[in-house]
């Protein structure tokens, strides 16, 4: 009975969170544009899509609360108590890499980026080249997030100052921007945002809080957060480096 009540509350919260987006889109469609929906978008499909979003978001968030959050924190505590730093770092990398590869936002952005880059002439204008670019971009971003989580875990262990590391990261970003292809700069900067989405953020946050709660002398509020900041800046650095040195990895690059 408790799970039903909890799901009902979460459903209400999801409706409340999505309502502003629906109202904004409806206002501009009906009041500003003043045009009916296109023929390709049936009203029934629109309503069903909104229902699927609300139900899916509700189940996703509840699943995180019931399973992935506790599991991530418990694994972090178990690795620390076992004293296996090497395995913890391997787990941190695998968690960052795996959650990012599965990120729906990254999959969508990578596919669109492949189309745009091929149109710009940076790679061949073929479906194979676009698919190769999209796949390579996803791997680069996933590797960067895995690396970022490892760096963040080391920061929690060592107590390194977060602000100095983030400042250094963005200085590197600015320097690499001077040498990266113009067509990839926007994609690189956006890659830092798409990685901090529905899957990556909860898992990485659970890991950080679990570690900071277990390591003696660490404060979960001060040290447990900040991994997402690394997961935002590191993809920018990696994608810029990919643009400078790694485009030859893409099938059909020019």
From Swiss-Prot:
> What pH behaviour does activity show?
Optimum pH is 9.0. Exhibits antiport activity at a wide pH range of 6.5 to 9.5.
Is Transmembrane helix tagged as a keyword?
Answer: yes
Task: Name any one GO molecular function.
Answer: antiporter activity
Domain of life of the native organism: Bacteria
Q: Where in the cell is it found?
A: Cell membrane
Q: Which GO terms describe its biological process?
A: potassium ion transport; sodium ion transport
Instruction: List the gene name.
Output: umpA
Q: Which organism is it from?
A: Vreelandella zhaodongensis
Keyword entries, A-Z: Antiport, Cell membrane, Ion transport, Membrane, Potassium, Potassium transport, Sodium, Sodium transport, Transmembrane, Transmembrane helix, Transport
Q: How does it assemble?
A: Heterodimer composed of UmpA and UmpB.
Q: What's the protein name?
A: Na(+), Li(+), K(+)/H(+) antiporter subunit A
For this chain, the family text in UniProt reads: Belongs to the UmpA/UmpB family.
Is Cell membrane a UniProt keyword of this protein? yes
């Amino acid at each position: 009975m408790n799970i039903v009540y909890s799901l009902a509350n979460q459903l209400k919260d999801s409706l409340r969170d999505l309502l502003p987006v629906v109202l904004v889109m409806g206002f501009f469609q009906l009041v500003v544009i003043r045009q009916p929906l296109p023929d390709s978008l049936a009203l029934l499909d629109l309503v069903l899509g909104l229902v699927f979003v609300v139900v899916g978001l509700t189940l996703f968030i509840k699943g995180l609360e019931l399973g992935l959050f506790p599991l991530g924190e418990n694994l972090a505590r178990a690795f620390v108590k076992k004293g296996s730093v090497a395995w913890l770092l391997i787990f941190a990398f695998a968690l960052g890499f795996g959650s990012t590869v599965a990120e729906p936002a990254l999959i969508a952005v990578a596919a669109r980026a492949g189309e745009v880059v091929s149109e710009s002439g940076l790679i061949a204008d073929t479906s194979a080249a676009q698919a190769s670019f999209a796949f390579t971009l996803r791997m680069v971003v996933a590797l960067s997030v895995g690396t970022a989580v490892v760096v963040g875990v080391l920061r929690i262990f060592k107590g390194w100052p977060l602000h100095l590391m983030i400042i250094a990261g963005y200085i590197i970003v600015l320097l690499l921007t001077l040498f990266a292809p113009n067509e990839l700069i926007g994609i690189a900067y956006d890659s830092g945002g798409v990685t901090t989405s529905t899957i990556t953020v909860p898992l990485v946050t659970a890991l950080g809080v679990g570690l900071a709660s277990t390591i003696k002398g660490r404060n979960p509020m001060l040290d447990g957060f900040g991994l997402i900041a690394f997961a935002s800046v590191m993809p920018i650095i990696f994608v810029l480096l990919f643009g400078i040195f790694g485009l030859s990895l893409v099938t059909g690059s020019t």
